[in-house]
Amino acid sequence: MTHKSVRDYIRTIVDFPHEGILFRDVTTLFADPRGFRIAIDQLLAPYAGMRFDKVAGLEARGFILGGAVAHQLSTGFVPIRKKGKLPGRTISVSYQLEYGEAVVEVHDDAIQAGEKVLLVDDLLATGGTAEAGIKLIEQLGDQVVGCAFVVDLPDLGGRRRLEAMGMEVHALCAFEGL
């Protein structure tokens, strides 16, 4: 019996959302019970024995992964959302996109000062969204003790960007190219 790797469950869609882009679609991983289980287990493996107070997930696929990881750790989950999507008082961080700027927010009471947080998302590209999420968590007086991703796109430099911030970065697989 041949065992599939996490990478084998991820579909590539050519020219989406723009011509020349190879979109790494993790929804096929999420849809497969075995693949999804393998991914969650492997996201947790590097952190075995570590204590986390919260898991934070980046919108939107980071919510799916982060919720499952938080469940496995028996800890709380904190969504980091696009501006205007959270109902309570928030803090925000803006970051640069290829063409313009984006803003992410978190509730100002979602994480208590001094808590240890694991940041989770599906894909690490340039690292801009993850960096903004880390800054939000740090503004609340907390420590990001790890950043876990299913896919790393190393050609876009996100891992280097986060490691330059002193972050420990873990990805289950990498895809070269755009």
Curated annotation (Swiss-Prot):
GO terms for biological process: adenine salvage; AMP salvage; purine ribonucleoside salvage. GO terms for cellular component: cytoplasm. Its main location: cytoplasm. It is an enzyme of class 2 (transferase). It catalyses: AMP + diphosphate = 5-phospho-alpha-D-ribose 1-diphosphate + adenine. It comes from the Bacteria. It is found in: Cytoplasm. Its EC number is 2.4.2.7. Pathway: Purine metabolism; AMP biosynthesis via salvage pathway; AMP from adenine: step 1/1. InterPro entries: Ade_phspho_trans, PRibTrfase_dom, PRTase-like, UPRTase/APRTase. Keywords: Cytoplasm, Glycosyltransferase, Purine salvage, Transferase. GO terms for molecular function: adenine binding; adenine phosphoribosyltransferase activity; AMP binding. Belongs to the purine/pyrimidine phosphoribosyltransferase family. Catalyzes a salvage reaction resulting in the formation of AMP, that is energically less costly than de novo synthesis. Homodimer. This is Adenine phosphoribosyltransferase. The lineage of its organism: Bacteria, Pseudomonadati, Pseudomonadota, Alphaproteobacteria, Rhodobacterales. The gene is apt.
